[in-house]
């Protein structure tokens, strides 16, 4: 019996470092990884605060070295490979599915090899973000892939461009050939432009949404909302074309306009496994997992 250090949830709604956590058992479609670096996400503290029962391993993003490969994994990982990706940390259904530990198990075919030009620390920041952006842009909004960019730029609004998800989304949407419009605070304007944003607006300004509609000649029909609260949804509604369009969020918010199709995505669904969140039961989504295999490096 082998123990390790890990961060786990405990009542009342807090987490702590333990030194007696068992090394997780390797499932057939998972890989065993020795972690080198991890990264933090808002979902980590949300799981600790209200989503996870006691005893769940915390953490989603990681980078590390493969120790063992499950027999059903299709990707040709081998022991010693440098890999990165994410897990469903704080998972009430599988309490060992977290990354804040010395040795972890992660769904094999959803993980990625680390490019030689990236350190473990850099690679650890990509897991949740890449899958989330992949879902939001390419599965939900059905953008063209960066490998086959569109020839004539179509406008897309990425609300919340200076967030971790937003910075990734700007770069990928630009590579896909779109005219990228984003929002952030003024001190981030130059960063947004350096990442590829064509137009940047201050979301604090009450006239910004109207300016976006005018700048796009009332043709903005694609929106990816990385903030996903009522205020951001209302902003996006005002910016979008009067003819309607597609609105993709990261939380359960929507635009009431009948000519706008609203939906939201959750990165955990790319794992293809059922789970519960705030008493909501999410069924397995095999097709989402199939698409998720492509949201990597």
UniProtKB/Swiss-Prot annotation:
Q: Which SMART domains match?
A: PKS_ER
Describe, as the record does, how this protein assembles with itself and its partners.
Monomer.
> Which SUPFAM superfamilies does this chain map to?
GroES-like, NAD(P)-binding Rossmann-fold domains
Which residues does NADP(+) bind? 162-165, 203
- For this protein, the Enzyme Commission number is 1.-.-.-
Keyword terms of this UniProt record: NADP, Oxidoreductase
InterPro entries, from UniProt?
ADH-like_C (IPR013149), ADH-like_N (IPR013154), GroES-like_sf (IPR011032), NAD(P)-bd_dom_sf (IPR036291), PKS_ER (IPR020843), Trans-enoyl_RdTase-like (IPR047122)
Q: What is this protein called?
A: Trans-enoyl reductase TOXD
Question: What this chain does, per the record?
Answer: Trans-enoyl reductase; part of the diffuse TOX2 gene cluster that mediates the biosynthesis of the HC-toxin, cyclic tetrapeptide of structure cyclo(D-Pro-L-Ala-D-Ala-L-Aeo), where Aeo stands for 2-amino-9,10-epoxi-8-oxodecanoic acid. HC-toxin is a determinant of specificity and virulence in the interaction between the producing fungus and its host, maize. TOXD does not seem to play a role in HC-toxin biosynthesis.
Q: Tell me which CDD domains the record gives.
A: enoyl_reductase_like
The miscellaneous annotation reads: The genes involved in HC-toxin biosynthesis, called collectively TOX2, are organized into a diffuse cluster that spans >500 kb. All of the known genes are duplicated or triplicated within this region, with some variation in copy number and chromosomal location among different race 1 strains.
Q: Which GO terms describe its molecular function?
A: oxidoreductase activity, acting on NAD(P)H
The highest taxon in the source lineage is: Eukaryota
Record's family? Answer: Belongs to the zinc-containing alcohol dehydrogenase family.
